[in-house]
């Protein structure tokens, strides 16, 4: 087989599919160190996989001789193409040898048999939905940062996608914070749910969905899910287990509701947190009607900071004092758009609910943060 393709286009597609390769999987199954090339007419299909996931990309080439398939070590072909300026290249494979010819030279490397490469997973065509790629991107970006990295509870290390007939709910939590993102614009017409590993969610949000404006087709079964875009498809194994009832942990009502300017709160918290204990990163909020005082202290090195910003709303006419982990709080605040947020509190031992007051039409965002115990209180 022989074909001609743009070196830059091939390199970019190889870079994308190679992101699914996992060094642990390839050590256990050496064939997974490779990328599979399959030529059919003028279409070249590239496939990379680990033991749980698989990514496929397609691009157009100029076929010069025959169809077929072979596999090449990912690092070999990527390193070779990385050093080339963009130009047409010719790739020919004969008797286990690949020869890549460019304007003033050539590379030769092994082309192994493709038969040992893992086969694709079959899905029931009835178990599929379609939704706008930008909508899925926003749902993942708004939640994935809150997922846990504690492998002792695998189900919490992913993004839970809960499809209803009239909406999509995306949830992630690490036990200290929780994000529930609801898109009422998504009308899938069916009810299903699955938990997507954070690594796969990150691949989707950082590389596959970020420039897509069309539709993504989602196919699924009990163990796997597939995200199909015009020129690339990602198949992943789902996290096993039952996701906790996320609605049950969000307080239905709160005694105090305080409205704060979001940019002011982010910048003030950042300045005060510089003087917080490095071990706890605790910052304390004292809310009254009209103001929010933010303070932190590091007893070990005798440093402290305090700053007051405007606040409005109902503080029940008395002081509301509560402590939060700065890193947890900041991760929530930086995920919001808009200018103002509502902070709903009951007392210093119960979770705070933070919601942005400005969102896109049909979008609801609710976040939860567990308070930290205040010493001596």
Regions found by a protein language model. Give the residues of each.
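Structural preference for solvent-exposed beta-strand-turn elements
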Residues: 1-377
């Amino acid at each position: 087989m022989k074909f001609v393709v743009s070196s830059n286009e091939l390199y970019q597609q190889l870079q994308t599919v190679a992101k699914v390769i996992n060094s642990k999987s390839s050590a256990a199954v050496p064939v997974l160190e490779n990328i599979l090339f399959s030529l059919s007419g003028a279409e070249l299909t590239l496939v990379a996989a680990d033991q749980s996931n698989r990514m496929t990309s397609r691009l157009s080439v100029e076929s010069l001789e025959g169809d077929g398939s072979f596999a090449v070590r990912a690092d070999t072909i990527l390193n070779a193409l990385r050093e080339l300026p963009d130009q047409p290249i010719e790739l020919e494979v004969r008797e286990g040898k690949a020869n890549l010819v460019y304007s003033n030279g050539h590379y030769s490397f092994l082309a192994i048999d493709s038969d040992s490469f893992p086969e694709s997973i079959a899905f029931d065509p009835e178990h599929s939905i379609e939704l706008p790629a930008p909508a899925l991107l926003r749902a993942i970006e708004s939640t994935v940062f809150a997922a846990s990295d504690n492998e002792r509870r695998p189900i919490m290390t992913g993004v839970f996608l809960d499809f209803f007939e009239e909406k999509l709910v995306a949830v992630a939590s690490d036990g200290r914070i929780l994000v529930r993102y609801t898109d009422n614009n998504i009308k899938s017409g069916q009810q299903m749910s699955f938990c997507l590993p954070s690594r796969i969610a990150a691949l989707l949000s950082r590389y596959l969905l970020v420039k897509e404006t069309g539709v993504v087709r989602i196919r699924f079964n009990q163990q796997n899910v597939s995200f199909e875009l015009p020129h690339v498809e990602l198949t992943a194994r789902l996290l096993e287990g039952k996701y906790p009832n996320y609605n049950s942990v969000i307080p239905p009502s709160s005694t105090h509701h305080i409205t704060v300017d979001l940019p002011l709160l982010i910048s003030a918290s950042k300045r005060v947190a510089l003087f917080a204990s490095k071990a706890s990163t605790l910052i304390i909020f004292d809310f009254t009607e009209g103001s929010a005082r933010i303070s932190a202290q590091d007893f070990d090195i005798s440093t402290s900071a305090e700053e007051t910003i405007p606040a409005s709303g109902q503080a029940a006419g008395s002081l509301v004092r509560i402590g939060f982990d700065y890193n947890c709080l900041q991760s929530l605040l930086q995920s919001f758009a808009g200018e103002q947020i509502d902070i709903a509190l009951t007392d210093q031992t119960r979770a705070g609910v933070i919601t942005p007051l400005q969102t896109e039409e049909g979008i609801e965002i609710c976040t939860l943060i567990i308070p930290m115990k205040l010493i001596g209180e």
